[in-house]
Regions:
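Bacterial N-terminal signal peptides
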Residues: 9-19
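Core segments of cupin and vicinal oxygen chelate
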Residues: 33-36, 43-90, 135-150, 177-229, ...
Length: 299
């Protein structure tokens, strides 16, 4: 007879605790780990001999400045690279010129996203469907991890020991992700769950001129989140060069003026300007091989 009041009290305690636990899980699921688009960088790897040429051309094209170049180990296994940030009004590049062979899988990650709590961010990414390719490791200024989203999209998350303070962009660049038609939905769901972003548009018949195939169409998904803009291009993989090689699209005020600066600084215009989706776009290759999409609003 004395067991019943005891069981009742346990049930009451559990009923009070369970909603709190559920609330804690929900709060964790809704935590924003991103900081802002100005803290997200495109990772660019060039040969050491091309580093200075790339820096000069990229900054001459977009403006901005470089941080001091350092030589460091930025991988968990032994390696050596020059490292610097190119900070422009339209996007930031993390530039690496490896003096040693590049340890796997470095060089395949597209971007680096600053997060407020790297351990919690990794757990959130895994819960959203990402794999951890390189577990968290220290670097000279913080900690890093390399993850992979459904569809094979590699990304680095990083955290700084000293909180950085960067100026906001004049225009926010777009992370351009090429995926198979079969994996586009899985990637989008996974990334949205992690980033708490939103789909701005989902066009199942976007103009094929945007991927170099004038007579065809493809699916284009535009996403916005605290990490900035992302464009998912779901295709059959039949892409003429250089489509699929670019990782970032940079928005500028005057496309023709920007292309003139690019040419004058040693870059090559691979695709001349074309009009689509209310903007003018072109493709440029900088010294060292980095390919970028550049666009401006149609006038």
């Amino acid at each position: 007879m004395t067991a019943r009041p005891h069981l009742a009290s346990l049930w009451l305690a559990a009923s009070l605790v369970m909603p709190l636990a559920a609330h804690a899980r929900d709060a964790g699921a809704n935590t924003f780990y991103g900081v802002g688009a100005q803290y997200d960088t495109t990772h660019v790897y060039v040969a050491p001999d091309d580093v200075d040429k790339f820096v000069a051309s990229f900054l001459a094209t977009f403006g901005g400045q470089s941080t001091k170049q350092v030589v460091a180990t930025v991988t968990p296994t032994p390696s050596s690279t020059t490292s610097q940030l190119l900070q422009t009004p339209v996007g930031t590049v993390s530039l690496f010129g490896f003096k040693t062979p590049i340890p796997y899988p470095f060089g395949a990650e597209r971007t680096g996203y600053l997060v407020t709590d790297i351990d919690a961010a990794v757990r959130a990414a895994q819960a959203a469907g990402a794999d951890v390719l390189v577990s968290t490791f220290p670097d000279p200024i913080g900690r890093d991890v390399v993850i992979q989203w459904p569809g094979g999209v590699n990304m680095q998350l990083y955290w700084h020991t000293t909180k950085p303070n960067y100026a906001t962009f004049e225009t926010i660049p777009e992370n351009r992700v090429y995926l198979s038609t079969e994996r586009a939905d899985a990637f989008t769901r996974s990334f949205l769950r992690f980033s708490h972003g939103k789909v701005v548009s989902d066009d199942p018949r976007a103009p094929g001129i945007e991927i170099g195939r004038v007579e065809d169409s493809f699916r284009r998904i535009r996403i916005e989140s605290v990490f900035g803009k992302m464009t998912v291009l779901a295709t059959d993989g039949h892409l003429p060069f250089p489509y699929g090689r670019e990782m970032t699209g940079y928005e500028v005020k005057d496309l023709n003026d920007t292309l003139a600066k690019a040419r004058a600084s040693g870059a090559t215009v691979l695709v001349e300007p074309f009009a689509s989706d209310h903007q003018q776009s072109a493709m440029v290759q900088f010294p060292g091989g980095y390919v970028a999409e550049i666009h401006a609003a149609a006038k």
